[in-house]
């Protein structure tokens, strides 16, 4: 079973992603609502990290650069921001993929599988 860390401050979106990922019992899902909480939880090993760009205490893009210091697992950004500058910056700071909210469950699964 793959371990996934969801870093998302919107509780409803985090709940939806958790539901999608746990449907087939393919993922053990851990959630963080802030960059600080994510950094604490990231001490453990994960197979994939799903990361929001807009976190309350730090940019998800900056957090990605920090996570890259000790994680080489895929990092997928999930954000409602769909402008080119944000997407390019997220990928340049170590993101492996970028999914725009709202997203389809099947697309989320396909993107995760493509990056694992």
Short names for language-model regions:
Residues 1-116:
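N-terminal/domain-start alpha-helical segments
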């Amino acid at each position: 079973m793959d371990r996934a860390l969801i870093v998302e401050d919107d509780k409803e979106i985090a709940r939806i992603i958790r539901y999608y990922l746990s449907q087939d019992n393919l993922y053990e899902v851990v959630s963080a609502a802030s960059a600080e909480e994510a950094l604490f939880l990231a001490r453990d090993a994960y197979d994939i990290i799903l990361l929001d760009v807009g976190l309350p205490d730090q940019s998800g893009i900056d957090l990605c650069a920090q996570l890259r210091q000790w994680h080489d697992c895929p990092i997928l950004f999930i954000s409602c921001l769909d402008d080119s500058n944000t997407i390019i910056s997220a990928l340049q700071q170590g993101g492996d993929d970028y999914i725009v909210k709202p997203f389809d469950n099947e697309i989320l699964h396909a993107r995760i599988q493509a990056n694992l």
